[in-house]
Amino acid sequence: MSSVTTSGATRSTFSFARIWDQFGMLVVFAVLFIGCVIFVPNFASFVNMKGLGLAISMSGMVACGMLFCLASGDFDLSVASVIACAGVTTAVVINLSESLWLGIAAGLLLGALSGLVNGFVIARLKINALITTLATMQIVRGLAYIISDGKAVGIEDERFFTLGYANWFGLPAPIWLTVACLVVFGLLLNKTTFGRNTLAIGGNEEAARLAGVPVVRTKIIIFVLSGLVSAAAGIILASRMTSGQPMTSIGYELIVISACVLGGVSLKGGSARSPTWWPGS
C-alpha cells in the first residue's frame, strides 16, 4: 500500500515539475502583470500597453531568430552589431540612391550575408559558435563605424519613417511585424521538417547526421534567418530613430538570449517553444 502511495506521489511531483518547466515563466509573468495592474495606476491603459508592445517589438523579432540558434545548440552574438550595421547601411544607401526599397534590400542583404558567414564557418569549418559570432560581432560593428564614418547617418527620405511610426488597426506597425514573425517562426519550428531537423540537431547532432538530417545546410539556413530578422529589426529601429546609428544596440544580444532562456528555451539545444520568448522580454 505504501509503495503505491509513494509511486503516486512521485508521479504527481514529476508531473508538477514538468508542467512548471513548461509554463512556469507564463505563471510568473501573469502574477507580475496582475500585480502591476492592481498597484500601478494606468498600467493597463491602452497607451501604456502600446508602449510596452513597442518596447519588446525589436527584441521579439530578433528572439525569433535566436530561438532557432539556441534550439540547434548554438547561439548568435552578432545580432546587436547586425541591427546597428543594417540600420546604417539602409540609411546610406537610401541617401545615395534615393530609393527606399533599394536601401531596405541592402540592409536585409547585409544581415543575410552576416548570417551566411556565421553559418558556413560554424557548420562547415566546425569552429565554435562563441568564437565565430564573437568575431563577427566585432567585424560587423566595425563595418558600421566605417560605413557611417563614426557618426549617425540622417535619412533624407521621410517616407521611410512610416515603417516605424505607421499605425495598422490602431497598433504601431512594429508590433504587427513582431506578431507576424512570431507566427511564421512558430509554424516553422512546430509544423515543418526544418523545425524538427533543428530540434534534432540540438538534441544530438551526430545522431541527426546519421539519421539523414542535412546538418550543415540546416545550420546555415538558421544563421541566415537570424541575420535577416536582426537586419529587419535594425531597419525598423533606424526608421523610428530617423537615422542609422553605429553605436546603437550595444549589448543587445544578451537581452535577446535572456528573453529566450527565461522563456524556456534550453541553452543545451534540442528544446524550444516558439511563443515563449515574450514573457522573458
Predicted regions mapped to residue ranges:
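Single transmembrane alpha-helix segments in multi-pass membrane proteins
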Residues: 31-96, 120-127, 257, 264-274
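Transmembrane alpha-helical segments of polytopic membrane transport and secretion proteins
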Residues: 1-24, 44
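Alpha-helical transmembrane segments of multi-pass integral membrane proteins
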Residues: 31, 36, 40, 166-200, ...
